[in-house]
Amino acid sequence: MAEKKTLSKQRARSILHAASKKIVLVTGDAMLDQFIWGEVDRISPEAPVPIVNFKRESFMAGGAANVARNLTSLHCSAQMHSVIGRDEAGKKLRILLKDDHVDCQSLINSNSRQTSCKTRIIAQRQQIVRVDREAGLDLESQLSKRLTKSIETGLSKSKAIVIGDYGKGIITQDFLNKIKQLGKLHDAWLSFDPKPVHSLDLSELSLITPNRKEAFELAGICDSTKNPKPLKDKNLIRVTKQLIDKLGLKILLVTLGELGMLICQPGKKAFHIPTLAREVFDVSGAGDTVIGTFTMAIAAGADPIEAAILANHAAGVVVGKLGTATVTPKELLDSFN
């Protein structure tokens, strides 16, 4: 089927229907997101910082786990393949994922790891500060082998994997190489959310989804100019071509914040998709929504342009919500009105 430059609501509905019968495997750093909500009405006499009056707290699955819950929110089945600690944060994360209908049979608890937890303090609809609790140790060889085996088993039912690298130690080069080998063996689609400071060989992947800053870092090029029209941004286009050629990617999807996203394919002109967000309250986890929705759409038979447009619509919905949010099929289809 020839690639389209637009996506109708009817076609989006058809993709979502097909996706409801698919399974996507998710691996990488599964984290717990804690939100403390409060109000600020004065500055502390102890230091020039706001005093937040506590109102409530909430917890959500974060990192690669947020990709999984974004998939199930869209009625696509998701398997979580990761390692978390045998601690309270790990227990809470597992419960949250099960509540979100994520398959957690391959979510391994380990005494040697701490579950990564990000605590965000929010007042007046703005994030005041974030506190990170994490070990960041590389995954032990034995646990890596267990994860690899579980992914291999999962590929008997799925042909798509999302790999979320948040620099917390799950994604090592050895583990990534094994996933690539399995991808080749099973002809599976491999989507990767990169962390440039975590230097890895990203060749032979189907898709990577860096933001602008990450794309320039991956290419080793200084981002000295920025054109409000991405297709006329010579430096950006140069970076995308270099990454496509260097890594042998099928798709490069660069997220550009308020400028939308740029989808690039070998031998084709880059295609710009403007943002659809009307109001932006919180970008936490928006990248997870993009990579999850795109991969789900590809698994459901969408072409890359259709998948990118659908992912852009999904991102436009979640950034209008506070917290690590997801989008439902109804919300996604309503965004086409």
Regions found by a protein language model. Give the residues of each.
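Conserved phosphate-binding/catalytic loop of the ribokinase/pfkB sugar-kinase fold
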Residues: 107-113, 120-155
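Substrate-binding N-lobe of the ribokinase-like
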Residues: 5-15, 45, 49-116, 332-335
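Conserved phosphate/ATP/ADP-binding segment of small-molecule kinases
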Residues: 169, 173-270
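Positively charged, low-complexity intrinsically disordered leader regions
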Residues: 1-41, 336
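Active-site metal-binding loops of divalent metal-dependent hydrolases
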Residues: 30, 166, 289
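Short acidic, glycine-rich surface-loop motifs adjacent to enzyme active sites
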Residues: 157-170
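Structural motif
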Residues: 25-27, 130, 159-162, 191, ...
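Conserved post-catalytic alpha-helical subdomain immediately downstream of the catalytic base
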Residues: 242, 246, 250, 276-335
